[in-house]
């Protein structure tokens, strides 16, 4: 490979100009569209926030927005609810998030950390009422849901953020700057892998892969519902089934198609975010996934998904491949790169860039010893939640807003869709359909239990 010939100073100026131009337009849109009750709200004024999902990730998210006023707590588990209420005793308490929206006048913003299959249901009423929303990843449980929620947020002009905290880290932003300024030349392929192997597997495989549960089939026997858990509310729009501890508490539910979407959409929300952002991706042309024979109810522990993306402006077509569990990219298997457990590898005409959450390296290192990267041009932020809170008050754009995050969520779900159908899909993003696979329609949209609708 030849030494990169890019002029960092020129590239930095050009990309900074493009970035600031697009950011200014976006910021103007958000400022003009900010709900009236927050226009001109000072940074020192606190938001009134409703917490939907107070345990697990919800507890962490609550702590991350605790600089504001926590006025509502909601969780299907009374134990989680009461534990959170010890810290926020003045907050109103609910077990059914649908009811809190009946008395929402004092709420400025909502943080949603429920199980994946109820994300859209907890988020949509907030958007329709003009509340700002922070939602855990993945944004929704399905492809059509993701598009619907993203469009609703755009129409309502509310400030949104999906919970992909790595998007706010300096390392991710630096990688995007390096890729966009041509540090390794045009990128024509990228590989993303995570070592987590949770899902359909034997007890022995689960032990080796450090999975907290082993699931091969839906349990036939029921178990007593834990005290304080409102199981029917946890099920929400999902088909009715008796309680068993292979479903709850989280993150056990994420292995089951009725409640989650496996590692592909969970960790894929974090790791696929980096190539999605750096390569300016949106909708793939085709998707083809490989793995063990699909189970009708349980997500796989290991699989891969290959995406073909077309040219984007002056960027060439690119192939992006996802690997999870025991499956790894060829560069890793052949030991041509450092053996990181998780990573993103960009392969360019002039070199490669390997990154994870906290670090990155240009390869081969000998070619980049004297390399000086571009000056930073993507604004740094104090944190993912902090960025959202500030945006709620000022109208500034957020990095993982629902327009961006919705498209990322769609792409991740498409990997699962191709896997479950066992076909290479030709994707029509306008009509949300696979041109060559009409049977995909049943999985692109969703059927909800009686009493639940969007």
PLM segments and residue spans:
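Predominantly a Rossmann-like dinucleotide-binding segment in NAD(P)-dependent oxidoreductases
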Residues: 53-57, 61, 161, 166-288, ...
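N-terminal secretory signal peptides and thylakoid transit peptides that target proteins
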Residues: 6-27
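N-terminal Rossmann-like NAD(P) cofactor-binding module of classical short-chain dehydrogenase/reductase
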Residues: 110-111
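Beta-strand-loop-alpha-helix segment that lines the small-molecule cofactor/substrate pocket
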Residues: 116, 120-168, 175, 182
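N-terminal Rossmann-like dinucleotide-binding module
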Residues: 23-88, 166-169, 275
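Short amphipathic alpha-helix with an adjacent loop that forms part of the alpha/beta core around
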Residues: 99-105
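Conserved SAM-binding strand-loop segment of SAM-dependent methyltransferases
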Residues: 92-96
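Glycine-enriched catalytic-core subsegment of oxygenase/oxidase enzymes
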Residues: 60, 66-67, 74, 78-80, ...
């Amino acid at each position: 490979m030849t030494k990169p010939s890019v002029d960092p100073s020129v590239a930095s100026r050009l990309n900074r100009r493009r970035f600031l131009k697009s950011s200014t337009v976006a910021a103007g849109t958000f400022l003009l569209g900010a709900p009236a009750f927050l226009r001109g709200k000072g940074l020192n004024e606190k938001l009134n926030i409703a917490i939907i999902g107070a345990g697990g990730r919800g507890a962490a998210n609550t702590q991350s927005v605790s600089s504001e006023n926590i006025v509502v707590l909601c969780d299907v588990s009374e134990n989680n609810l009461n534990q959170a209420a010890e810290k926020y005793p003045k907050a109103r308490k609910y077990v059914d998030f649908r009811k809190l929206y009946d008395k929402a006048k004092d709420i400025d913003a909502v943080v949603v950390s429920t199980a994946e299959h109820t994300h859209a249901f907890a988020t949509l009423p907030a958007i329709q009422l003009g509340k700002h929303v922070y939602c855990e990843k993945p944004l929704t449980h399905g492809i059509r849901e993701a598009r619907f929620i993203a469009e609703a947020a755009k129409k309502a002009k509310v400030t949104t953020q999906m919970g992909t905290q790595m998007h706010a880290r300096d390392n991710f932003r630096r990688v995007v700057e390096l890729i966009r300024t041509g540090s390794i030349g045009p990128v024509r392929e990228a590989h993303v892998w995570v070592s987590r192997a949770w899902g359909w597997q034997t007890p022995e495989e689960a032990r080796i892969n450090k999975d907290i549960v082993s699931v091969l089939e839906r349990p036939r026997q029921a178990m007593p519902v834990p005290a304080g858990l409102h199981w029917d509310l946890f099920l929400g729009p999902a088909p009715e089934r008796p309680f068993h501890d292979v479903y709850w508490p989280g993150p056990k539910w994420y292995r089951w198609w009725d409640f989650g979407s496996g590692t592909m959409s969970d960790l894929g929300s974090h790791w696929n975010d980096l190539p999605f952002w750096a390569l300016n991706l949106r909708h793939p042309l085709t998707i083809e996934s490989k793995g063990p024979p699909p189970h009708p109810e349980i997500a796989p522990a290991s699989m891969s998904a290959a995406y073909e993306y077309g040219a984007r402006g002056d960027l060439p077509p690119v192939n992006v491949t996802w690997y999870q569990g025991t499956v790894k990219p060829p560069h890793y298997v052949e030991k041509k790169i450092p053996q990181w457990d998780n990573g993103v590898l960009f392969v360019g005409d002039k070199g490669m860039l390997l990154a994870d959450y906290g670090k990155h390296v240009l390869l081969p290192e000998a070619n980049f010893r004297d390399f000086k990267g571009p000056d930073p041009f993507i604004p740094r932020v104090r944190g993912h939640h902090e960025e959202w809170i500030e945006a709620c008050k000022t109208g500034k754009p957020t990095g993982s807003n629902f327009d961006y995050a919705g498209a990322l969520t769609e792409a991740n779900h498409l990997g699962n869709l191709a896997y479950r159908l066992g076909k290479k899909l030709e994707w029509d993003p306008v009509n949300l359909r696979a041109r060559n696979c009409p049977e995909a329609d049943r999985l692109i949209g969703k059927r909800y239990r009686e009493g639940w609708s969007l």
